[in-house]
């Protein structure tokens, strides 16, 4: 490439840090009539920049220099300030993600990708921490079952072995077991032969519980429900050891039951679009570790990923980002058109795929904040042209909140929620409700008129007005609304709404004390976009510190709540999450998820003793 950016921390102060940016012209031609465009996950103070002007939308920054010529083999330099308190720059991923130079005096405008060198950090480097040595386990089972009785000997599955069904609810689990035995071990059970694996009903077991017995023969998987058989199959798959043409399984008795009814994983597909097969791959892994819920984050400021047949603009416009698109580039892939969406037929495929593995799919449609993709796609319904309110969201947008005073907002909600409710069998529909910035709606004549009509005294009460409409709508469709922690701030929603609490476990318990049912999702332990170490090359964010494998494993939910405290009944379960601002490919996804996912799986299934 002919251009390169060097980016460095010049000075660190308690609130703001000063940065230097150098754009090198490495070509043999002068660079004229240029502008620089790049992404960074921090907000640049617009009045702090030298020798240029800057405009920022989300993570996408456009820099216009005072002198728009860089001679061949010369450079441009500027400085600017970023608020870094309380989160200083620790990682290379804190720096500039991607960049391009645009030539503005020709049509069509020409764009050149720019090499971005790793940020020169001012803070002392931390060496990558070593994972503590551990003793090898005699049995590799994750999560650890409640009861294990190891017996002498092993059972051999041979070329003549087959799977026998003695339960009407075991068929789909048996199909999955066959598929995974073939995929993982290249072993194909026969339709005719010895019934060496038997799945049979045990009505004494609760939903999700199972009994697995291996002695002389046959291998017995017992459960009272489809998901119980899936869990039993997942355990059997971990016990198997290849031995030539056979598979050996240790003689053992395992009794297991989930600790929480809800054991979930959230995947953000809005910040970066993840292809269907990547989504299904994750769901299959969740089944192996006995999760039973896949929370699908389908909409956000950066993209709308679900087909709504009555509103095709949402995916025609809102599913795509790029320099020549309505939505600007964000995070990565700046000079490419990035995005995509899932058709309703593809979503049905995912729902069926997950159901075969005992997993319920919960969709999330994030409102009233995080709605920029929808607003840009449907401005005739969702844009309030008279609103002069000044605000900036936590991701640096000033136009990402739905207006509770526009009739189009309610038409939009009706269309979307009706199609979503018809598409997803899940009783829960996630409505977001998080991170509505201060300052919204205060200078909108329409919103002020609505406040006067309803007797509201604070503009934030309008969020409750909108959420209660969504809650009532979902209830009429036979669904229960769930939302992030902010949904319960103030008198916004009824106690029928389930709260996903992400700030801390103590915050979750406070929600439960108010009478809400709660899903535990403390970011300090369960957010998989959190970096795993303070080494600068480690990808991730650190607003909640770092979460190495050991910390994820040692997380013990509700350890300070007495066993018989009725508050425990309000805790429906636990969930981990992967936000994907920094995740745009399979390798990065795997790195962020594993092995911490396997450690957190135990928090939903077994009771660990904290160190």
UniProtKB/Swiss-Prot annotation:
Induction remark: By (GlcNAc)2.
Regulation: Inhibited by mercuric ions, PNP-beta-Glc, PNP-beta-Gal, PNP-alpha-GlcNAc, and PNP-beta-S-GlcNAc.
Pathway: Glycan degradation; chitin degradation
Substrates-to-products reaction catalysed: Hydrolysis of terminal non-reducing N-acetyl-D-hexosamine residues in N-acetyl-beta-D-hexosaminides
Thermal activity profile: Optimum temperature is 35-40 degrees Celsius.
Enzyme Commission no: 3.2.1.52
Top-level enzyme category: hydrolase
GO MF term (any one): beta-N-acetylhexosaminidase activity
A GO cellular component entry from the record: membrane
Biophysicochemical property: pH dependence: Optimum pH is 7.0 with (Glc-NAc)n (n=3-6) as substrate and 5.8 with (GlcNAc)2 as substrate.
Compartments where located: Periplasm
SUPFAM superfamilies (alphabetical): (Trans)glycosidases (SSF51445), beta-N-acetylhexosaminidase-like domain (SSF55545)
Stated role: Hydrolyzes aryl-N-acetyl-beta-D-glucosaminide (aryl-beta-GlcNAc), aryl-beta-GalNAc and chitin oligosaccharides. Can hydrolyze rapidly the artificial substrates p-nitrophenyl-N-acetyl-beta-D-glucosaminide (PNP-beta-GlcNAc) and 4-methylumbelliferyl-beta-GlcNAc, and is slightly active on p-nitrophenyl-beta-GalNAc. This enzyme is not processive, i.e. when it hydrolyzes (GlcNAc)n, both products, (Glc-NAc)n-1 and the terminal GlcNAc, are released before the enzyme attacks a second molecule of (GlcNAc)n or (GlcNAc)n-1.
Family designation: Belongs to the glycosyl hydrolase 20 family.
Subunit organization: Homodimer.
Protein name listed in UniProt: Beta-hexosaminidase
